[in-house]
Amino acid sequence: MKIYLASKSPRRQELLKKIYSRFEIIPPEVKEEVYSLNPMELALTLSRQKAENVAAKIKEGVIIAADTVVAVEGKVLGKPRDEEEAYFMLKTLSGREHEVYTGVTLMELPQKREKSFVEVTKVWFYPLTDEEIKSYIDSREPFDKAGAYGIQGKGALFVAKIEGCYFNVVGLPVARLYRELREWGY
């Protein structure tokens, strides 16, 4: 059975290679808006929407869709639209704990078998200076990432510790995904 990744994210593509050497990428057409849902519901809802969007384009295969959400005290931080928003997000994360939620939806066609789950990882940031934040924003790294940082890049310098799956923070909880797919026989 063919495997499809419903994602434009180069990080998710790289992570899925840890499980499968061959898969096809079909970018979903979904507006990733911050709804008035809690972070867990939002991550699940967006991953389901992505899977359903790709399911409408294929007849047979296994679809893997994911969405990652960063939240501080239940308040969702999406992808920053500009430097000001990136600054605000990084200032909010500075010296604090936050959670990273990745909702994953698996869909098998034509059987219409579906499974969704959310992986949560806690992340603690060191206190950040304005200079560190501005320098990081100047690197342009924050702009396509939930919460305005990439733990796999220069954003790693801000992380004091994590509790849970590192790859979840990058964008795809590969160990959990592997086990869920194995339960389905893949």
Curated annotation (Swiss-Prot):
GO terms for MF: dTTP diphosphatase activity; UTP diphosphatase activity
Cell compartments where the protein resides: Cytoplasm
Highest taxon above the source species: Bacteria
CDD domains named in the record: Maf
Main location: cytoplasm
Enzyme Commission number(s) from the entry: 3.6.1.9
GO biological process, one term: nucleotide metabolic process
Keyword annotations: Cytoplasm, Hydrolase, Nucleotide metabolism
Catalytic center residues: 67 (proton acceptor)
One GO CC term on file: cytoplasm
Catalytic activity: dTTP + H2O = dTMP + diphosphate + H(+); UTP + H2O = UMP + diphosphate + H(+)
Enzymatic class: hydrolase
Cofactor(s) named in the record: a divalent metal cation
NCBIfam families: maf
Function comment: Nucleoside triphosphate pyrophosphatase that hydrolyzes dTTP and UTP. May have a dual role in cell division arrest and in preventing the incorporation of modified nucleotides into cellular nucleic acids.
Family the entry assigns: Belongs to the Maf family. YhdE subfamily.
Protein's recorded name: dTTP/UTP pyrophosphatase
